[in-house]
Each structure stands twice: as structure tokens, then as C-alpha cells.
Amino acid sequence: MRRILYLEPVGGIAGDMFLAAGLDLGISPAELERALSGLRVPGWKLAVSRAVRHAISGTHLDVVLDAREAHPHRAYADIRRLIEEADTLPPRAKERALAVFRAIGEAEAKVHGVSIDDIHFHEVGAVDSIVDICGAAVVLELLGNPEVHAAPPPLGSGTIRVAHGAMPIPVPATLELLRDVPVRFEGVGELTTPTGAALLKVLAHIGHPPDFIVEKVGYGVGTKDFKDRPNVLRASLGRLEQASNEGLWVVEANLDDATPQLLGHLLERLLAVGALDAWVTPVVMKKSRPGHLLSALVEGGTREAIVDVVLRESTTLGVRYHRVERQALERDWVEVETPWGKVRVKRGLRQGAVLNAHPEFEDCRQVAEAAGVPVKQVMAAAVAALGPKD
């Protein structure tokens, strides 16, 4: 079963908000701390509390540092070694955390015009940021490794003072991390931090999630209190009702230059490949040109094979498909006796009652040819032999 985690950075995203949202979904703080205990960084603990922002209640998390711990400027190689040597981190969590730090390092290197090996992390190299990023990787592990999707994050505006001095918001590293993905330029102050941006870039697909059934909702509350929005990250965890290729689908394409011979061939091919039904509808297309709409009703497992036939063997440049639902009568076959021989009849039933009945045409044709009578006469006799509908 596919699991989905959908993140909505209503008031932005930071590393501590990601962890807090995971805890609000039900993750045990003690279990999270155990997984992070192998990090060889001194003087930290998790402080978990309830908080409210704009009438939304959620979990707030602080990484509380030992007062004696300085904030060293760690190099990328130092952080990589810390993560690799943490024997309590699950292997997949290590891979994710390393990927997030590498993304941050590459963004910082691009901004400063140096090699990643020459980068020394300042705020992101501090103990709390290391715990945030490794903790986010552990959160996904404890949630069962769901697919992560996220809404476009708001970036904020203004300026902020960091180790390098005053910087515009979003800071250069944040914007570099979120190149080529949808974002929102709105809000006042720093709504999305470099750590939050890196978590989204590496761990999530930014855009609309697939339709899914929401089972749990958690709110990670940040440290800020914005006037225009709650500083919360909403996390919805659930499951897909069905895989995207299940159920019934209609595959269709518009054709403006298909010959009758080609249309007939396409219908035969679609049915041969596994379409439940296939048909052609006359349509009027752009510039008032007559054309044809080629359609096929298919089960999800054969959808891609049907799409392949349409693209390979028709003249279309594209294919559409959409999910459909249907109600069908139960069906069975009975054999009836006519004055000229036996004929099969297909019946449609609902709750045991016969609603429709259709003699098998090929049976009727063969009997009619052998007896020298019209086919319609055999068909009428077959229906009469079936008796009244029950």
C-alpha cells in the first residue's frame, strides 16, 4: 500500500517545524532521541511542548543546547563523517541526511563561488541544525517511509542578519536550493529557512499530491509569530485509495486524417490488446474540420499498452485518459431450442431478475444459413423460446 505524507508550509518551513509535525503525527520523542543518540555532538536534548499560532494548536520543538557548547563552523567533510559514524541512525536515514547536507553544501558553494570542500557551514553547521536534518530523516523512517509531497513554500521578504552580515530574504542559499521548483514570493520575514528548503528539495515532490485518504494530521509550530499567518507546518499522512493505474479508464484521441480502413484496424487492435470496448465517434474539430474521436474503455492494468497502440498505430500526436466508473448487469449464457436448432442467448440480470436478453448473432447466422431462413426469424424464435423476463 502506498503511503503519502503531504506537507503544507502554511507559515513556512524550518527543520524544527518538520520534526515537530512528525511528533504531532504520533512519533515518540524518546524513539526519535534514541535514533539520534549516536550523533557524536555534545550537549543537546529535545524539548517538546504544545503551542498555538493563530488559534491553531500543534507541537513545538526546541533543540536545547548545553550552554558550554560553542557553535563551530563545521566543514562539509566534518558533517559527513558525523552522520556516517552515527551507529544509531538507520541506513536510509543516513542517506537522506547526507543528501540534504550535500544539497545545502552545493547551494552554498554556488552562491560563494567556491568548491563544496571549501564550504564551512555556519548556522546550518550548528548542533541544532544537524539534529534537525538527521531528525527529519528519522521521522520519515518512523512514519514508514511514505512518499513525500509538498505545497509550494512561501519564502518571505525583507532582510535578515546572519554570519555573513545582512542578507535579503530569501537568503541566497534558500533561493538556490529551490531553483526549478514552484515557490511563492509572499509574507514578511524569513518563512522558509535554508534547512527547510533543503528538506523540501531533497525529500519531497513539490506540487499537487495524488488523491489519498487522510488518516492523521499534525501541526509543527515554529518559533515565530507572524501577523498575517500562523507559523505552522501542516502534515497530512494517509494512504492511496487505489494505485493510480487501477480501476476503469477511457483512453481517447482526436484524429483528423484517419481513413476508414485505419479506423477499423485501430478498433481491432485495441480490442486485441485488451480493451473492454472500443469505438469511433464523429466530431467537428478546430477550423470546423470533421474528424473522429477514437475511444477505448480499459482496465488500469492494460492502460499503458492501449496508449502505446494509439500512439504507434494512429496519426495522433497525443492521448488523453481519465478514470471512469460504471455499473454493469450480471451476465450469463443459456442455450435455447428453436425450430431450426440450438442457439445461445446472453442474459443481463440484476438481483436475479432478467432485464435484457440477446441471442448470439453468430449462432443465429449459422442456423439460418443451414435452414435457409432469414437470420431475424431465428433471432425472434430464440427470444420467444427464452420466455418472458423473470
Curated annotation (Swiss-Prot):
Pfam family, one: Ni_insertion
Gene3D superfamilies: mk0293 like domain, Transcriptional regulatory protein pf0864 domain like
InterPro entries associated with the record: Ni_insertion
Keywords carried by this UniProt record: Nickel
An MF annotation (GO) of this entry: nickel cation binding
Keyword flag Protein biosynthesis: no
Domain of life the protein comes from: Bacteria
PANTHER family noted in UniProt: NICKEL INSERTION PROTEIN-RELATED (PTHR36566), PYRIDINIUM-3,5-BISTHIOCARBOXYLIC ACID MONONUCLEOTIDE NICKEL INSERTION PROTEIN (PTHR36566:SF1)
Similarity comment: family membership: Belongs to the LarC family.
HAMAP family, sorted: LarC
Name recorded for this polypeptide: Putative nickel insertion protein
Organism of this sequence: Myxococcus xanthus (strain DK1622)
